[in-house]
Structures are given as C-alpha cells and as structure tokens.
Amino acid sequence: MSNASGTLLSYMFMMLLGLTLASLVPHETDDGDLNAEISLANRHSQGSFTSDYSKHLDVKQAKDFVTWLLNTKRRGVDAQAGANLEKRHSDGSFTNDMNVMLDRMSAKNFLEWLKQQGRG
C-alpha cells in the first residue's frame, strides 16, 4: 500500500470515527440549539468528507490516465498500428491480385469452353 493510500485510509477512518462519535452524543431535549449545532456539525463533516474523497478520486483518476498514456506510448502501440496497417495493405493487395488472376483464368476457361461448343 502506498503512503498516500495509507494516509487516505487514516483520514477516512478518522472522519468515520468522528461521525460515529457525533451521532452518539446525547441530545438534550430542553435545548433545541444544541441539537441544531450537532446536526450542522454532522452535515459539515459529511460534506467535508465527501468533498475530500471526490477530490482524491479525481486526482487518482488523472494519475491513472497519465500512467496508461505513458505505458501505451512505451509499448509502441503506434508502431503496432503502423505494422497492422501495412499488413492490411499487403493482405488487400494479395487478395486483389488473386481476384485479377482468377478472373483471367475464368475468362480463359470460358473462351475454351465456347471454342469446344462451337466445334461440336
């Protein structure tokens, strides 16, 4: 586990512990202001946690994308794409040459068949 992940987990644990403790504080029914303050504190801590966690996920996603981008460049995906394009071109050229040859053979066979039909 990396240091940043460990720090994040510690931070998340502390936030969850704080939320749990805040929810366990006894509510005084005589004083509505105390309940309102606790409620505001809970909402603030939940909002702060959500905001910080979202920022962390955005940064992690950006780092993962950059890592992926660098890895694909290093592996030579661009070179592979060029090789695939050349292979497709050569395959297409071969197929085209075969089609031309087969068309000529078919025409030659047809002419020979016509000649044989004319003799008979």
From Swiss-Prot:
Keywords: Cleavage on pair of basic residues, Hormone, Secreted, Signal. It is found in: Secreted. GO terms for molecular function: hormone activity. It comes from the Eukaryota. The keyword Iron-sulfur does not apply. Belongs to the glucagon family. This is Glucagon-2. It comes from Petromyzon marinus (Sea lamprey). The gene is gcg2.
